[in-house]
Amino acid sequence: MNTIKQSFSTSKLEGYTKQLPSPAPGICLPAGKVVPHTTFEVIEKYNVLDDIIKPLSNQPIFEGPSGVKWFDIKEKENEHREYRIYFIKENSIYSFDTKSKQTRSSQVDARLFSVMVTSKPLFIADIGIGVGMPQMKKILKM
């Protein structure tokens, strides 16, 4: 995970000459903060990763369903190198624990706080962005 964060935060914004939006790509936000569309636009149009990052096992750590509209990755509190991946699909909300490999879901009237349409891998583009997390944690009781 640290390799991914490092690659994303040091990647080049090839061709971008304007002042970076606030928050800039790669900056972690407190839970509940909405990421402005301008930040997503910079990621979509200018972010270039120099390296392909693969898991040590050379296998995907998680295969999600198709049609995922949003997700976020959070490191579990007081636990190092354990992460939970949250995502929304249609009217369901899911969490995937990278240690236990367990997926939990709950039916909800899912509301997206931010929507990003990107040709880049969403896994890379969405690191550390806490959009709508308090509501998700309450629903999943985490």
Curated annotation (Swiss-Prot):
PROSITE patterns reported for this sequence: SEMA
UniProt domain Sema: residue ranges: 1-142
Coiled coil ranges: none
Record's miscellaneous remark: The WR equivalent of the semaphorin-like protein is split into two ORFs which are likely to be truncated and non-functional. This ORF is the C-terminal one.
Family: Belongs to the semaphorin family.
Name assigned to this protein: Semaphorin-like protein VACWR164
